[in-house]
């Protein structure tokens, strides 16, 4: 972990922005150690350009670093957003921004949101210039996919003051989006017209909802005016979600499924690695790996005892570096070695494994030897592209913590 932290600090030295603050509070500029970037330009949101011209929000990169280094106080202080309450963070840039007097219309493509996800927190982050005047604004939010029918999500009033510190303004839109998640509609194929959703939204008792746009103010998909104070690069919706327990892990976007469906995977490079074959979820894949050497303990027949050894996974070597932003490599560890007969508590055997070792001692031809396997695993937080969006997700059972015999 110390090595990973050091790598992250070097990687983020020139591309970081301050920690987020609670909605309706002006952000304080708090760059990471070694940062030399003044974050007051919308263009900085693009991050470093990849050779395939991909972009990622710097906010997502810092959120990833905060989680890995344990500096997650910014989220822990927010209501209902303890670190353990979410396992996925999805960032969505606005697809379109339009303006009609003091009414702003923001459109997002939420097709990447899984039906099995439960919304924990939704933040609308808007980058405003220092010269932005103070006046009341009504913001209408829509889901729009490929310029097709528009799904009205909700509206709220905002009065963003002139900012003297960070130009970022953060709004908590969780209550506005919760009905959309609870409907459990297939957003890839089912769309409601803006007028229908607006009429339904206006009747909600939620204080964060305001009256729906009137007939003369309804969203016009052909409207071309762009707000003076923002553009799509400076408007981002950040969704903190958790897979519902009722989903029973069916359809959960595992790393294997994400890799198989990613358009950024280097198939040609991966095909050159010998011996690659597919496994079930939660099992390590047989990729090109670098194994470190650890001093061995020996038993009577000369074989080392069951122990944990290094297994460095380098995503560049397996053709995954194009879609995985961080980490570029990590130590997954693995288990190898012999299990003594009979077993003892040092190797954390189950009762069944212990009895199996006893039978093996007295009847060696009857059963096979216990196997050296992982008995404790830990998750790995990963920042990567899922389709055209950037996702921060905690993948379970990615690192071997302890080995034992079973």
UniProtKB/Swiss-Prot annotation:
Residue ranges listed under propeptide: 19-281
Cystine pairings recorded for this chain: 306-372, 335-403, 339-405
Classification via InterPro entries: Cystine-knot_cytokine, TGF-b_C, TGF-b_propeptide, TGF-beta-rel, TGFb_CS
Annotated region (Disordered), positions in chain: 195-222
Inducing stimuli: By dorsal mesoderm-inducing signals including smad2-smad4, activin and other nodal-related proteins including nodal2/nr-2 and nodal4/nr-4. Shows autoinduction by nodal/nr-1. Induced by vegt, acting in an autoregulatory loop. Beta-catenin potentiates the response to activin. Not induced by wnt8 alone, but wnt8 potentiates the response to activin. Suppressed by ventral inducers such as bmp4.
Any single GO BP term: determination of left/right symmetry
Tissues of expression: In the first phase of expression, localized to the vegetal region of the blastula. During gastrulation (stage 10.5), this expression disappears and instead becomes localized to the dorsal marginal zone, with enrichment in the organizer. During the second phase of expression in neurulae and tailbud embryos, expression restarts firstly in two symmetric patches near the posterior end of the notochord, and then in a large asymmetrical domain in the left lateral plate mesoderm.
Similarity remark: Belongs to the TGF-beta family.
Protein name as annotated: Nodal homolog
Organism: Xenopus laevis
